[in-house]
């Protein structure tokens, strides 16, 4: 590194986006310097006010080293009315396999949910990222809103399907339907990288148990909660007016269908919306410290893989009186689930 300019030819110099060090560049590589990096984010994010120049910074980092390390700075950024995007890379407790408890983030969305100016999204597919970034830039530049978007993105390779029709509004509001069925007896909510496990669990429910599940992709539990809370507040203060319903309540209006929600974060993330979901609601999450393991073993350890989702769905239906309770024990045996395995939060 040389502060007056790059003195060598990088190995990727033939590529369009090759590594380069220049004084007037647009990419700052701050290294392991969280305080300096977030300060650069704040400087760029307040440029619209301090210098009259709209700059929309994208601060990209290991998601564990964002709110966990610099939440005080992020809070200060909100106080200074900064604008921009925080991108937590390698996010989720089970997607970053092999790096142990220091790196596996399962709780940054709790911190984001508690920060008033943060709009937090846990994204599963590339089209969701495109929609959210476009909407965020529209809010910050065109509508001049003082908001910061927090996006968690993962490092796991899987097939990205085409965007369903009319999904854009739901992606922004926090939830959209990804698979329909004529008469669902169960509702599955998935988030981020665990959408793949939810889809596979739905296939097992259909093939092994003749249970049809409607599937929803949740892009933001916190945005769903905030809108539902605002609707409830308005209804509280306007009892003489027509009562409002949130996006969540409009879409999930069948009281007879139990819901199982799954995310790669602690249960409290998906439990945010429990008071506003009609019918029984059960959350699966990754409570506990991370571990150095494969994705498959991590998801089984934290009880969020397809087999635990199936078991949770069967239990939800059994408790609702829709199927026999003996089906639960059948599922435990069929999928070789150890009833005596340690609880993940105690290990």
Regions found by a protein language model. Give the residues of each.
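Generic long, charged, amphipathic alpha-helical segments
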Residues: 41, 174-182, 186-187, 202, ...
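Short conserved micro-motifs at the rims of enzyme active sites and ligand-binding pockets
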Residues: 97-100, 162-164, 227, 271-274, ...
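Hydrophobic alpha-helical bundle architecture
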Residues: 47, 243-256
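Hydrophobic, well-ordered secondary-structure elements that form the walls
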Residues: 41, 112, 125, 188, ...
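Peripheral docking tails and interdomain loops at the edges
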Residues: 12-18, 119, 126-127, 254-347
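Thiamine diphosphate
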Residues: 1-161, 167-171, 217, 222, ...
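Long hydrophobic segments that form regular secondary structure
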Residues: 138, 146, 168-214
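Short hydrophobic beta-strand segments
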Residues: 57-58, 152, 184-191, 260-261
